Amino acid sequence: MSLRGQVQIARSVFLLRIYILIWVQCLILMSVCAFCWLVLPHRLEQLFSSVRLTLSCLMISIVCLGLLRWAEPNFPKNVWILLTYTLLTSVAVTASGFHFSHRSVIYAMVATVTLFCFLTLATYLFARDVELQRSLLTGASTLILLLFAVFSLFPEAVSEILVMIAGLAVIVTSVVCDTQDILHDIEYESYIPGALCLYMDLMYLFVSVLYFMPSEPGSAHTAQTTVAATAAASPQFVS
């Protein structure tokens, strides 16, 4: 077998291990969700509407970062560019989470992106010098402005669905491109950043699938109405 064939097999096995890791984490997450659904079904249903709003903010950041990535083809392959990509996503999700007062989602996302930052820095601590690109500053500014504009001018459900579809298309395209790069084009110096980029794309793809889970927006309102009615009726019952 030629050296090129051996490298192809090694990269295919590496990709397979990444997908196995993703599936194991997804199964663990689904098991936890199923357990919570059985133990606290009403509490979980009340959280669906807030989770959907936060994931919509995440999709907006993915759309902006995807456009920035296509504008600069080498965007995700460099360690510092990838680190900036991760930090931009963290800023976008954190800002949107504070906008809707979803503190638990903020903490979870910050913990995830912090892990990616430490992995990237630890792997390429002595990387070669990298030229800073103006497109990063432009993309960061555009991301902040777009987040503000969309949620100020278009709060309806229609814009939420459009953003979700666009974000899903960007994620699927990114997964396909990253897979092809790891199999064929990526250099060994950028192998781990490329794998981390693929891992992030798959994580966002799984999060976007959770977005399409059916929810009952009126469940929280119904529960609050029931609690208020019970509290109002309690003094009359006692008297």
UniProtKB/Swiss-Prot annotation:
Indicate yes or no for the key word Nucleus: no
Q: Which domain of life is it from?
A: Viruses
Q: Which residues form a coiled coil?
A: none
| Compartments (UniProt record) | Membrane
The record's annotation in InterPro entries points to: Bax_inhibitor_1-related
Q: Does the keyword Translocase apply?
A: no
The UniProt keyword set, sorted, is:
Membrane, Transmembrane, Transmembrane helix
TM segments?
A: 20-40, 48-68, 80-100, 106-126, 143-163, 164-184, 192-212
The name on file for this protein is Uncharacterized protein HWLF2
- Which source organism does the UniProt entry give? Human cytomegalovirus (strain AD169)
Organism classification: Viruses, Duplodnaviria, Heunggongvirae, Peploviricota, Herviviricetes
Corresponding gene? US21
